Amino acid sequence: MLHVLQRKDMLSMTHEVYLASEEAKEFLNSSEKELLGYSYEWEGENVIHLHSHPLQHSFGLAKRCLFTSEAKISLSDFSEDIKYIATISQKNNKLDTKVYKLDGSDVVEISAKLIPGKDELYSRSKGLLEVEILSKKHVAIVGLGSFGSQIAIELAKAGVGIFSLFDFDRVELHNIGRHSCTLKDLGRLKTDAIEEAILGKNPYAQVNKYAINIATQKDVFCDVAKKVDLVICATDNNDSRFVIASALHKYQRIGIFGRAITRAAGGDVFRYKPGGPCYGCLIGSRILDSRDEEVSSEEAGRRSGAIPAYASAEDVNAIVQVGLSVDIEPICNLMLKLALLELSKGMQSGISSLEEDLKYDAYIWANRRDNNFSNWHPFYKSGPKQTILKWYGITIPKDEHCAICSEIPTLDTGLKLSHPMYSEYADVDFHLDDN
């Protein structure tokens, strides 16, 4: 006679099991009575995850498990490879799941928890975000470095359902200090690593991956851009930004651009809305100076031209000066707020009031009084004067000679232009738009 132990002391000694409710429902609705699945065990932590299919990027000790609709199990159902058996049924329109493990000659019932389905996973965000609507939104993210990787994961946590990821780089050691990826991701394509991170937060998301350079494969990007609801530009060079800006204008799509300056002393965010000033207008307005842009790596610097071919190792070290992860957080956060605001537009949500606050085309942030911001006023008792740790909004005029959006274009890359805001007289010459 089969002996099943269900004592509380035995339950506490055995593993805790997690099972995706969507996978359990899928099995229950199939015609199969049994299904060989996969168990992934965190050894030494008494935690396992059961899946009906193999994970693309597995973790822990992988074994097989058995899903069955039969309420009764026998010792013969277990084997050297099958360590766990899950019985799945439905009672009163609710899933009834029990998981068992063979312990010597005894079958022990294990405490099992169901991972919520798609409708429940982000229920705590309801009221603040329209999760059901966001699940149908399609966002393209170009550049999966410190900015893009974090933004992708946060949008997944918010419930965005469709992603198109663009980046041809791999995760390298110099990325780890600020990147969302970890040491275990070294050498992997960033598109693969961030796909895994997205699905780890939102297993119901659809992720499309493009390990390409959009500056040389514009057609591929444009084919995607015309289908999305929003584009996040988190690249580190103007070549790709102009490709994105042109596609946004051509297909009338919204875009959010963000960058940090040297050592992340500060940064800026620009939002393109169809009919408004584009990224070309922003460059032509002389607000940005690309010479001050942060160079995140030698490879990126050589691609963009920030590091010349003849540069010595000492020169390279002087040019490649990245900032702290904590210093890019405010810039990423505003990009995310603008993205969620645009994706939720027209819906009554908990962030709708931000539409009255975030009306500017561009925003500038300073983390500390270094480099371009050295003559800004100390935060302490700054009053109305320009200071650090505050967002400043700017209205950008449309450029009638813009190379991207005007009828009479004149190309201006803006590489040697700077706004008085970044000059030594920044606190005097720069005036915020009070309208």
Could you say what each language-model-derived stretch is?
Residues K94-L134, E154-L155:
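Non-catalytic propeptide/linker segments at domain boundaries
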Residues A193-L230, T235-N238:
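A structured beta-alpha segment of the ubiquitous adenosine-cofactor-binding alpha/beta core
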Residues V142, F166-F168, Y210, C233-A234, ...:
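Generic beta-strand/beta-sheet core signal
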Residues F168-Y204:
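Glycine-rich phosphate-binding loop and adjoining beta1-alpha1-beta2 segment
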Residues E172-L173, T216-Q217, A265-G267:
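Generic structural signal for helix capping and beta-alpha/helix-loop junctions
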Residues M1-I110, D223-L230, A234-N435:
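Glycine-rich phosphate/adenylate-binding loop
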Residues G127-E172:
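Glycine-rich adenosine-cofactor-binding loop
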Residues A152-E154, G177-R178, V243-A247:
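Short amphipathic alpha-helical segments
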